A protein has these predicted regions:
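Short intrinsically disordered terminal tails
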Residues: 1, 143-148
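Short N-terminal "domain-start" leader segments
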Residues: 2-32, 72-102
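Low-complexity, intrinsically disordered short peptide segments enriched in small/polar/basic residues
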Residues: 14-15, 59, 129, 145
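Short aromatic-glycine-(Arg/Gly/Cys) micro-motifs in beta-strand/loop hairpins
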Residues: 26-48, 95-115
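A short, exposed loop/beta-hairpin motif centered on an aromatic-Gly-Thr core
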Residues: 40-61, 110-127
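Short, structured interface segments
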Residues: 55-77
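Boundary-flanking segments of nucleic-acid-binding domains in nuclear regulatory proteins
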Residues: 86-88, 135, 146
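Mixed-charge, glycine-accented linear interaction segment located at domain edges/termini
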Residues: 118-144
Length: 148
């Protein structure tokens, strides 16, 4: 699997749909997807890879596949966009949350849906993002992409 295309991800009914390049056949890119669930480990499709079992030659097509499957089979239907405050930095996915005036985050590296976030609370979203960016900037990156 190539890196997860977090910068292309979309949020849909309590899931984050994350496309990635599955393969290339005759110069044609084939996309698949992985999911994160707002319910985390309680969600049936948390960290699932392409539960629909279909692929597409476009990112929009793979979103259609994922959304159709989630609409038919998901156990999570959330009107709240749990993934609203998501950012990519150096191809890492950062999701910032607020609860009772405190901020915390989830951090996923470019090739894995294992949360590597430090257990730390912040006074503001900006403090949280600055701390994460400073930590990531300490290490050289083979690929640079900053959208924080």
């Amino acid at each position: 699997m190539n890196r997860l295309l977090y910068e292309k991800s979309i949020s849909d009914n309590g899931h984050l749909i994350i496309p990635f390049v599955f393969s290339t056949v005759n110069s044609q890119t084939i996309y698949s997807y992985k999911l994160l669930s707002a319910l985390v480990h309680k969600g049936t499709f948390h960290k699932a890879e392409n539960p629909a079992g279909f692929y597409s030659n476009s990112i929009e097509g793979i979103f259609d596949v994922a959304q159709e499957h989630l609409n038919a089979h998901s156990d999570v239907f959330s009107p709240v966009d749990y993934f609203k405050c998501r950012y990519t930095y150096r191809y890492n996915l950062i999701i910032v949350y607020e609860e009772s005036g405190k901020y915390f985050y989830d951090h996923y590296k470019s090739d894995s849906l294992n949360n590597v976030a430090a257990p730390k609370l912040f006074q503001s979203k900006d403090d949280c993002l600055r701390w994460i960016k400073a930590g990531l900037d300490r290490y050289p990156a083979s690929e640079e992409a900053a959208t924080i």
